Design a protein with these regions (language model features):
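Short, Lys/Arg-enriched N-terminal segments with co-localized hydrophobic residues
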Residues: 3-22
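C-terminal motif of bacterial Sec signal peptides marking the signal peptidase cleavage site
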Residues: 38-41
Length: 528
């Protein structure tokens, strides 16, 4: 009898395996695997049933049915090079508050995929995490600071860290919300790690809002539908009922739907509100306005009218990361990738205040003193580099910073060999190593507010100890360069990156830093 049961189970597994491998659009494998992932978080190790029960379909077999990550679309880019200060001593870039690239990396490692180097944007790895920077004071909406110390992966080089923090808002200071939920219900979203997860997130967000906040709900697949007119959160049951009815089928008329969502936001526009379109999709815009350039142009036009954008990406194998990053940047918004319930809670609950922009068109300009610095390299921010002339051009769009959000940037710098002699030379009047200028607007149509921070040329030699955040940032950057196989990674190794990250665990309010250490132990075909 036991042999007979084993035979039946074996044949059943084979039959299911054959059927599932041909169901390319059903994604049952994703559903089964994702349900396990979502129940316990993002980085748990998975194996056979812990209770010793015979699994009808093993984890490895389920993983084999998941769509290949090769279908995901990323823009290729080249790492920023070293620049000689004799050629150009000034570097300018827009802030980037996204964290999608880090969550995509976590998804790939969790599912056993190799990392696509083009998916690794080091600035988004850094800005996924909250840093323990000094809060703004008085009427300022932003604080800035800088540190410099030895570069761990290049002996003789130094690392410059720029730290930026947005003003935190109390519950009473939060502006009223005018949110339009724009939900992709096309067939490709029919998965527990896509539409089901998005529905959970939108429902969780409701619990964070105030009764007088307002929600609209628009869906798109082959057609565009307005499921819910602008409704106050005081009628939460009505909103939750509309969310519960979301089901996936059809193709994707994304461009048409996006326009309707913006028009809905404009209809209920209030200059005192947080007017925002929150779009959830796997990025498969295959019907209607599909050109990324056309979408960007449309989004920019509504951004100028005061409507912000939050882009939420879901799933693997169909993710159009390139489109979502460009659209969110153009829409005065942010781009998040939701790979699990923990990430959904991070975005919709723990960091929900970051949906409110406290600094608009935020730009950084770093001036290196050629008397002391021979070369520098901005690590990351490749698609946010700006012309130096645009720094003081208030009409030039730049990035936004959410309430309580921190932004981090790193430069690798090479000091001149006669550095100390120059510093001691009394005829050299400028003793500044670096000048960090920053500009932002409190409101989209307001004036730019300048901030400035300087580091004196003796700073690299004051070995009084650096904040733990400095070492953590260095570890994150080293890990990102390893995953990208960057030509500038120098002597960086996984063990070096882990050691640096461990030094930054004293500040870890939600456990995200500790999670990074676990991810570093996961196998990727990465150079050591």
């Amino acid at each position: 009898m036991q042999d007979f049961l084993s035979f039946i189970v074996s044949m059943t597994k084979i039959t299911i395996s054959k059927q599932m491998k041909t169901m390319k659009k059903n994604y049952l494998g994703i559903g089964l695997a994702a349900m396990s992932l979502l129940a316990i978080g993002c980085t748990k190790d998975y194996s056979d049933d812990a209770n010793g029960m015979m699994a009808l379909y093993s984890f490895d077999e389920m993983m084999s049915t998941i769509p290949e990550a090769g279908g995901d679309k990323f823009d290729d880019f080249t790492d920023n090079p070293f620049v000689k200060t004799t050629d150009e001593p000034v570097s300018t870039f827009s802030v980037d508050a996204d964290g999608a690239s880090y969550a995509i990396m976590r998804r790939y490692l969790t599912y056993g995929y190799n990392i696509n180097p083009s998916s690794v944007r080091i600035e988004e790895f850094l800005n996924y995490f909250t840093f323990n920077y000094t809060a703004p004071k008085g009427d300022d909406h932003v604080s800035i600071g800088a540190e410099v110390d030895d570069c761990p992966w290049n002996t003789g080089h130094h690392l410059l860290q720029l730290g930026i923090k947005g003003k935190e808002l109390t519950a009473d200071e939060m502006p009223r919300a005018n949110f339009v939920f724009l939900v992709d219900v096309s067939g490709s979203m029919n998965s527990s790690d896509k539409l089901d997860l998005l529905k959970k997130g939108l429902t969780e967000l409701l619990y964070q809002l105030n009764p007088d906040d307002r929600i609209s709900l628009i869906t798109y697949s082959g057609t565009v539908k307005k499921l819910l007119e602008s409704t106050p959160v005081s009628e939460a049951d009505k909103i939750k009922k509309a969310i519960s009815k979301l089901n996936a089928s059809g193709s994707t008329a994304g461009g048409e739907a996006l326009k309707m969502a913006y028009e809905e936001a404009l209809t209920n526009y209030d200059p005192k509100c947080n007017n925002r379109v929150i779009m959830g999709t796997d990025g498969d815009f295959n019907v209607g306005v599909t050109s990324t350039d056309a979408l960007v142009e449309m989004v920019e036009s509504y951004a100028r009218k005061g409507i912000y954008m939050t882009c939420l990406g879901f799933g693997t194998g169909n993710l159009n990361d390139a489109m979502m990053e460009k659209v969110s940047n153009a829409g005065n918004g942010t781009y998040h990738y939701i790979d699990c319930e923990n990430e959904m809670m991070k975005v919709f609950v723990h960091e929900r205040s970051q949906f409110v922009s406290v600094a608009n068109d935020a730009k950084c300009q770093v001036s290196f003193n050629p008397d002391y610095v021979s070369e520098y390299r901005l690590i990351g921010y490749e698609n946010r580099v700006m012309s130096n002339a645009d720094f003081e051009n208030d009409k030039k769009d730049a990035g936004e910073i959410g309430a309580g959000q921190t932004i981090t940037a790193l430069y690798e710098i090479v000091l001149k060999k006669d550095y100390w002699d120059t510093f001691n030379d009394l005829t050299v009047s400028n003793k500044n190593l670096v000048t960090f200028d920053f500009r932002y607007k409190k409101s989209l149509d307001g004036p730019s507010i300048p901030l400035k921070a300087t580091l004196t040329a003796d700073m690299p030699f004051n070995k009084y100890g650096r904040p733990d955040d400095f070492y953590f940032a260095a570890g994150v950057a080293a890990y990102g360069m390893i995953l990208r196989d960057s030509p500038y990674k120098g002597d960086a190794t996984i063990e070096m990156a882990k050691s640096l990250v461990k030094q930054g665990l004293s500040f870890d309010p939600n456990g995200y830093r500790a999670e990074l250490l676990k991810l570093m132990d996961k196998k990727n075909e990465q150079p050591q």
